[in-house]
Amino acid sequence: MSRRCELTGKAVLTGHLVSHSNRKTKRRFLPNLCNVTLLSDTLGRSVRLRISANALRSVEHRGGLDAFLVKAGEQDLSQNARLLKREIEKKLAAAA
């Protein structure tokens, strides 16, 4: 399982740990990933995703998983999230 957010694409970054004497050693900045179950109102079912804490805040800010995915660009989404987005868009188009 990769250390990448399924909704925002946040991944591991690398950099330096700098000591007081300015000595640099390599380190990794890991994203704050959480395994969450979100409810899709359109599909009427729950979905398990591995997303960052920042993405979880963004989902709640936008008004739910469906609203987030409809506005999200496809380049940042994982394959699982892209399929979910297409399902939601089809269901919304059929309802309209």
Curated annotation (Swiss-Prot):
A Gene Ontology biological process term: translation
Annotated NCBIfam families: L28
GO molecular function, one term: structural constituent of ribosome
Gene3D superfamilies for this protein: Ribosomal protein L28/L24 (2.30.170.40)
Natural source organism: Methylobacterium sp. (strain 4-46)
Protein name: Large ribosomal subunit protein bL28
Similarity comment text for this entry: Belongs to the bacterial ribosomal protein bL28 family.
PANTHER family per the UniProt record, alphabetical: 39S RIBOSOMAL PROTEIN L28, MITOCHONDRIAL, LARGE RIBOSOMAL SUBUNIT PROTEIN BL28M
Gene it is expressed from: rpmB
Keywords: Ribonucleoprotein, Ribosomal protein
One Gene Ontology term, aspect cellular component: cytosolic large ribosomal subunit
Entries under HAMAP family matching the protein: Ribosomal_bL28
